[in-house]
Amino acid sequence: MAEIYPSLVQCAIVATAFKVLLFPAYKSTDFEVHRNWLAITHSLPLWEWYYEKTSEWTLDYPPFFAYFEWIMSQVARLADPAMIWVHNLEYDSWQTVYFQRWTVIVTELVLLYALQMFVDSTPGVSKRAAHAAAVSILLSPGLLIIDHIHFQYNGVMYGILIASLVLAKKKSSLLASGLVFAALLCMKHIYLYLAPAYFVYLLRVYCLPPKLSPRSIFRIQFFNCVKLGGGIAAIFAAAFGPFALKNQIPQIFSRLFPFSRGLCHAYWAPNVWALYSFMDRLLISLAPRIGLPIKADALNSVTRGLVGDTSFAVLPDITPRMCFVLTLLFQAIPLIKLFMRPTWEGFIGGVTLCGYASFLFGWHVHEKAILLVIIPFSLIALKDRRYLGAFRPLAVAGHVSLFPLIFTPAEFPIKTVYTIFWLVLFLMAFDRLAPAPTRQRLFLFDRFSTAYITVSIPLIFYCSLMHGIIFGKSYEFLPLMFTSSYSAIGVVGSWLGFMVVYFTE
């Protein structure tokens, strides 16, 4: 088969040139967060990393990410020694900005390598579709907005995730897949949401006999279990062991899992609770007319979604336990099928649906977590047109919901034009590359997908531009609420559509 043009490397070179131009762009408080972590890991002994609180941006990622920051800090001191002083808060010299921006680009090479692994592992007939999916991830507006403007290190971590998913394709590399994912968990604990799919797939394919029966279910492949369990234990020991020696595990867990936060973030992530919050807002206006009681204390919470604020004025309050039960329930449903039919595509679908469930029903979900769904789904979105039909509204809703992260006027045309161009280019390319399904497509869902994308155009125009012209500084929460709620409709609709596709495959 002829080489596909442009290659991933060529796309990465062009993308890097564009990202370098964004070095002076807006940066969020996450920039100071990571500068402070560089300072903590470089200036303080290991035992003090998870106790240091000079800055409000304390270290709250697992140890492997702290080690990652320590490695970068060894180079940071050469770029500008002042950036790694713990007490040098809010320090952002141009050397610091350029250094931290470059670290995001350089570490994103892990993503490039993983995507090339994905393309190379795909059979010839499907390689062009796999290449298109890989390029769409490499040039993702989500990664551009979150990593290269807002500032985070998602590229390297999603690269590790994709490498783990690709390694799961072959039985010979299943062990490596599980160990790579374990290492990822020790870098960022948000990937715990995907762990149930890994557990079920590795249990079924690696630890149990290939042909399952009531008798053979208890005949585990003992040596495989020992290798997998021992390898995972060794990785967690390498990450947490030094801190366990100082009895610091409770302190680390208190940083990793702060349960005092509210149900919704200050800007509602586009999930079920965004629709629930929106419904509560509507009922506040309707309650006096239809005789519903209103909780007066909840009305005092104007912004709704502040830390610790989970009250609703009309609807019942939601507790962390409810979120946990719902998340677990909607993760378990597709995992039953994965256990019974453990194919690689089914595994990627299971990972995607675990991401959906955690995003839609989780407690205090950030809008950035939508990448947990978009990126694994991208790997199978071109399997056929039924899959693509479920992916379309997710791609639109997920990326548009990230717009409020970047609220500065200078970056408005960048995020808007880039995202729209990406959506038009890749959704059109995907439509040409996705083969016809073997089963009948969902007519109503196709209509929903088309209607949803059509309505999103004027909504983006109003929320991004017209609201400010009409109302100025008034009703500032209104476009955020519209964006979140409408995006939530797209994500929920996409989830329902993909659930149908997954179970009828």
Swiss-Prot record:
Class of this enzyme: transferase
Domain of life: Eukaryota
Membrane topology: Multi-pass membrane protein
UniProt keyword annotations, A-Z: Endoplasmic reticulum, Glycosyltransferase, Membrane, Transferase, Transmembrane, Transmembrane helix
Record family assignment: Belongs to the ALG6/ALG8 glucosyltransferase family.
Annotated PANTHER family: DOLICHYL GLYCOSYLTRANSFERASE, DOLICHYL PYROPHOSPHATE GLC1MAN9GLCNAC2 ALPHA-1,3-GLUCOSYLTRANSFERASE-RELATED
Entry protein name: Dolichyl pyrophosphate Glc1Man9GlcNAc2 alpha-1,3-glucosyltransferase
Species this chain originates from: Neurospora crassa (strain ATCC 24698 / 74-OR23-1A / CBS 708.71 / DSM 1257 / FGSC 987)
Gene: alg-8
